[in-house]
From Swiss-Prot:
Organism per entry: Flavobacterium psychrophilum (strain ATCC 49511 / DSM 21280 / CIP 103535 / JIP02/86)
Domain of life: Bacteria
Gene3D superfamilies: 3.30.160.20, 3.30.70.1660, 6.10.140.1950
This protein's record includes keyword Protein biosynthesis: yes
Keyword Cytoplasm: yes
Protein name, per record: Peptide chain release factor 1
UniProt keyword annotations, A-Z: Cytoplasm, Methylation, Protein biosynthesis
Function noted in UniProt: Peptide chain release factor 1 directs the termination of translation in response to the peptide chain termination codons UAG and UAA.
Length: 357
């Protein structure tokens, strides 16, 4: 293990030197990529340094005990050895998890799409609840959110809402939220007090850079239209909203959130690029799924992943059998418990595959 950690330390030292070079700082794309790699290796190198010191302490303590000439030193060495041996398995476990290979997309920003499914107006209201849940979670994480496009429901919420999330390790954190979310509750419009079941689909797309996906402009039809608000009323009289249609795939992306046609077009291209990138990832994930059965796959958008049962105050994640009895907290963005448990299961699966130890 130490040999592998030494290679990582050398790589870390190289990056540390590179990120202070003027030519690297001037190249923002390269600087950002190297800085992310630096942050990813920093904690591992710190653990490596602790491991080296710990192994040296164990060796020193064993030598003192073997010598046995100084009784006081032997007692101190025994205490040092006991402490080191107690810490060693914990440290090895921490290093083991840090050595698990991360997905290349984990550091990327994301586009989140929430669409109302079965359940009519109640499904739109639930989609709005999920939107608020995620934006509050993002706010607590210090991430920025920006609405790209929305289609509001007739009784509140959204038939569809697309928003961008920017920050650190966004995709790696949110990717397991993709899938079908189901709600069981009495709708506000229900007069008989009957519980209804509705659903909304969440998609989490890693934001693609221009070098990730090449789009031939000849393959894209661009339409301009007047942006509209709730109920379809016109927000402005200029055709500032933009709709893009990728002819080879039939994928459509639009944006009407910005006042400027140019900004709407840029954002719409961002959505289109991410959708095309997600298609490529979905194919890769499908190939990976043939090789292994993952409990927490982030690729199947049709899988029912979570149920929000209001009458019982219970939120259940069906992939890992986790129940959380804090409906108010969850709907106000307290979903870290789900994030942590899903990442843990995913890491355990990767650990079995990677054969690090």
């Amino acid at each position: 293990m130490l040999d592998r950690l030494q290679i990582i330390k050398q790589k870390f030292d190289e990056i540390s030197d590179l990120i202070i070079q003027p030519d690297v700082i001037a190249d923002q794309k390269r600087y950002v990529a190297l800085n992310q790699e630096y942050k990813g290796l920093k904690s591992l190198v710190e653990k490596r340094d602790e491991y080296v010191i710990l192994m040296a302490n164990i060796e020193e303590a064993n030598e003192i005990i073997a010598d046995g000439s100084d009784a006081d030193m032997v007692e101190m060495a025994k205490m040092q050895l006991e402490e080191a041996k107690e810490r060693l398995p914990e440290l090895e476990e921490e290093i083991k998890f840090l050595l698990i290979p991360k997905d290349a997309e984990d550091a990327k920003n994301v586009m989140v799409e929430i669409r109302a499914g079965t359940g009519g107006d109640e499904a739109s209201i639930f989609a709005g609840d999920l939107f608020r849940m995620y934006t509050k979670y993002c706010e607590n994480r210090g991430w920025r959110t920006s609405v790209v496009d929305m289609n509001e429901g007739t009784s509140g919420g959204f038939k569809e809402v697309i928003f961008e999330v920017t920050g650190e390790d966004v995709y790696g954190t949110l990717k397991f939220e993709a899938g079908v979310h189901r709600v069981q509750r009495v709708p506000q419009t229900e007069t008989q007090g009957r519980v209804h079941t509705s659903a909304a689909t969440v998609m989490v797309l890693p934001e693609a850079e221009e070098f990730d996906v090449q789009i031939d402009m000849n393959d894209v039809r661009v339409d301009f239209f007047c942006s509209s608000g709730p109920g379809g009323q016109s927000v402005n009289t200029t055709k500032s909203a933009v709709r893009l249609t990728h002819i080879p795939t039939g994928l459509v992306a639009q944006c009407q959130d910005q006042k400027s046609q140019h900004k709407n077009k840029d954002k719409a291209f961002g959505v289109l690029r991410s959708r095309l990138y997600e298609q490529e990832l979905a194919k890769k994930q499908a190939d990976d799924a043939v090789k292994r059965t993952s409990q927490v796959s982030s690729g199947d958008r049709s899988a029912k992943i979570r149920t929000y049962n209001y009458s019982q105050g219970r939120v259940t994640d069906h992939r890992i059998g986790l129940d959380v009895f804090d409906m108010d907290g969850v709907m106000n963005g307290k979903i870290q418990k789900f994030v942590d448990e899903l990442q843990l299961v995913n890491n355990m699966e990767k650990l079995k595959e990677s054969e690090i130890f």
